[in-house]
């Protein structure tokens, strides 16, 4: 399972800055589309081929009035699910009483804690860290979140115990499908409907938890693994069942999956939580199918309203198939696997370099790149750079000056001509290096001697 790293610390020590610095180290797999909502409290990141989830508890809050309420309930959920805790302190302010209280509170979690002394740029690191030795945390790191100093070595050390991510080696043939959605949208009902219709033998896979259950099954001689992120149900004081929604477990399921099935509730429309989940999936680059549940029984005007809202708010995810279903009664459920298979095969498809290069030439001839300083941007050739999502690498000159609008044009044209369905496409641009860049025009010794002879000859003629 992908590791989870939690950031904790008192306000204004730089948790959000470090979060942004770490999550920004991995380029987004797709363009930053207008209208795409991202939850900045949780994020995917990668360092040296090791993926992880990072949680910023800064937005969750720390109460510095009473020790008993030092951490909110949501903070404690995040810390309970974390594999590693990064405890941030301010190297310029020194040790405070709140820092001591937080350190005391962290001990009860029985987790690996790294003390991260931030804002040490321009300071002697040993002196900056010395003030915090009394906290009793052995792993101490000095960093500068704003300038990036020390972050690479910090990530290298905390990720060392975790293995490099290799999806291909974990499961050979089965298509992993993550069912993502808000509590009570019908994820478990849909999975039960699928399993009931197919009459398959279901067994629990080793290592599954109550929060995320993996269910393998076979349909039409194809193997699948359904990852249910429904969550833990607990009883409240008034004896009502309430579903505990874990963002972290959902993020882990999304990262493990080949295809994500986002379930929406037709009765409630598209909520902010739906948009946040969609943002996670888009950023992960996974293949996507959207299912609108509880479609049966709606009035026609309500259906039209939902379709209009989907078209307006999900325009940046127009690569995904949308299917209207009823998990309870089964209508539309059978067609989901057609969409899932299409999305999966599009995400893992391979294309030869000659084919991609010819397509690039045709696309750029149809709409030529703009000129920069009187010189036209040249797109020379393209090749495949990865799968799930498919990555196309384009080589050429002056690619740094290529406008975003032209990049979107290339993306849309490649998707259309390659017939990609249900998967985003990432395009990387690599410019050719000028071998004479930053080189001074230095004369050879022979040229120097010739120049001197000419100068002597010119003087003798005066």
From Swiss-Prot:
<feature type="binding site">
    <location>
        <begin position="181"/>
        <end position="188"/>
    </location>
    <ligand>
        <name>GTP 2</name>
    </ligand>
</feature>
<protein>
    <recommendedName>
        <fullName>GTPase Der</fullName>
    </recommendedName>
</protein>
<feature type="domain" description="EngA-type G 1">
    <location>
        <begin position="3"/>
        <end position="166"/>
    </location>
</feature>
<dbReference type="GO" id="GO:0042254">
    <property type="term" value="P:ribosome biogenesis"/>
</dbReference>
<dbReference type="InterPro" id="IPR032859">
    <property type="entry name" value="KH_dom-like"/>
</dbReference>
<comment type="similarity">
    <text>Belongs to the TRAFAC class TrmE-Era-EngA-EngB-Septin-like GTPase superfamily. EngA (Der) GTPase family.</text>
</comment>
<keyword id="KW-0547">Nucleotide-binding</keyword>
<dbReference type="Pfam" id="PF14714">
    <property type="entry name" value="KH_dom-like"/>
</dbReference>
<feature type="binding site">
    <location>
        <begin position="293"/>
        <end position="296"/>
    </location>
    <ligand>
        <name>GTP 2</name>
    </ligand>
</feature>
<comment type="subunit">
    <text>Associates with the 50S ribosomal subunit.</text>
</comment>
<keyword id="KW-0690">Ribosome biogenesis</keyword>
<keyword id="KW-0342">GTP-binding</keyword>
<dbReference type="InterPro" id="IPR016484">
    <property type="entry name" value="GTPase_Der"/>
</dbReference>
<dbReference type="InterPro" id="IPR027417">
    <property type="entry name" value="P-loop_NTPase"/>
</dbReference>
<dbReference type="InterPro" id="IPR031166">
    <property type="entry name" value="G_ENGA"/>
</dbReference>
<feature type="domain" description="EngA-type G 2">
    <location>
        <begin position="175"/>
        <end position="348"/>
    </location>
</feature>
<feature type="binding site">
    <location>
        <begin position="9"/>
        <end position="16"/>
    </location>
    <ligand>
        <name>GTP 1</name>
    </ligand>
</feature>
<feature type="binding site">
    <location>
        <begin position="56"/>
        <end position="60"/>
    </location>
    <ligand>
        <name>GTP 1</name>
    </ligand>
</feature>
<dbReference type="InterPro" id="IPR015946">
    <property type="entry name" value="KH_dom-like_a/b"/>
</dbReference>
<keyword id="KW-0677">Repeat</keyword>
<dbReference type="Pfam" id="PF01926">
    <property type="entry name" value="MMR_HSR1"/>
</dbReference>
<feature type="binding site">
    <location>
        <begin position="228"/>
        <end position="232"/>
    </location>
    <ligand>
        <name>GTP 2</name>
    </ligand>
</feature>
<comment type="function">
    <text>GTPase that plays an essential role in the late steps of ribosome biogenesis.</text>
</comment>
<dbReference type="InterPro" id="IPR005225">
    <property type="entry name" value="Small_GTP-bd"/>
</dbReference>
<dbReference type="GO" id="GO:0005525">
    <property type="term" value="F:GTP binding"/>
</dbReference>
<dbReference type="GO" id="GO:0043022">
    <property type="term" value="F:ribosome binding"/>
</dbReference>
<feature type="binding site">
    <location>
        <begin position="118"/>
        <end position="121"/>
    </location>
    <ligand>
        <name>GTP 1</name>
    </ligand>
</feature>
<feature type="domain" description="KH-like">
    <location>
        <begin position="349"/>
        <end position="433"/>
    </location>
</feature>
<dbReference type="InterPro" id="IPR006073">
    <property type="entry name" value="GTP-bd"/>
</dbReference>
